[in-house]
A protein has these predicted regions:
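Short secondary-structure boundary/capping segments
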Residues: 76-78, 119-121, 172-175, 203-208
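Glycan-recognition surfaces
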Residues: 125, 131, 187-220
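Extracytoplasmic, non-cytosolic globular domains
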Residues: 146-148, 153-187, 191-193
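N-terminal signal peptide c-region/cleavage motif recognized by signal peptidases
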Residues: 13-15
Length: 220
């Protein structure tokens, strides 16, 4: 009888302390900046699968800045004609076929960080600002991404060309609501500010930045 009680208590304790694991995986930014391609992303996914990283919790493969090709006449995002000539769906399908989840990048303002810091002109006017529902539908209903990192260079007047200064809580909340409106409840959103955003972030995101950029070195 005592053994049965011990087992019951163990099961109860396990359920009480159950939690969602952190978002672990790989992102293209620190190593490649905007110099990415569909072939590079799929090659990385293959390597992670081959080396068993998914089995130890590294489940996300995230396409960061550099895939943008501007917007068409209707405001729809298009991909870079050389880096992603076949669009994003083929790459996302490849990631999913390997059992991973696929992540993407955008900005809460008009322009991406790569457009400012890496002089990538195709990162201008591709952020969420003015396109919240349109971009959310594209990323999560049409393409099928599972994660999104949302930067704020386009909303920070010091880091964008039009000196657009936006309220970060308002912008991230609006994007969060646009994602929910797609019907997807499983999307993980990351708020990419360069310090702790504030307690409001608990209501809109699964994870967030707490510091300045790191770099691909052990010292960092």
């Amino acid at each position: 009888m005592r053994n049965y009680i011990s087992i019951a208590l163990l099961l109860l304790a396990s359920s009480v302390f159950a939690y969602d694991p952190p978002t672990m995986g790989w992102s293209s930014w620190n190593t490649y900046r905007v110099n990415i391609s569909d072939k590079l992303i799929m090659k990385q996914a293959d390597a992670m699968s081959r080396n068993g990283l998914k089995e130890v919790g590294y489940k996300y493969i995230n396409i960061d800045d550099g895939y943008f090709g501007g917007r068409d006449a209707s405001g729809e995002l298009i991909t870079h004609p050389v880096r992603f000539p076949n669009g994003l769906k083929q790459t996302v399908d490849h990631i999913h076929a390997l059992g991973f989840k696929a992540g993407i990048y955008s900005d809460a303002g008009r322009n991406t960080c790569g457009s400012f810091w890496d002089k990538d002109s195709l990162g201008i006017n591709v952020g969420f600002y003015g396109h919240d529902r349109q971009d959310a539908d594209y990323f999560f209903k049409e393409i099928g991404f599972d994660f999104i990192k949302i930067d704020f260079c386009g909303g920070d007047a010091k880091q964008n060309f039009d000196q657009l200064g936006l309220d970060e809580q308002e912008r991230y909340t609006a994007i969060h609501n646009a994602i929910l409106a797609t019907g997807r409840k499983d999307v993980r959103m990351n708020v990419c500010r360069w310090n702790f955003p504030g307690t409001w972030v608990h209501d809109v995101a699964f994870s967030w930045r707490i510091s300045q950029d790191i770099n691909p070195s052990w010292e960092s």
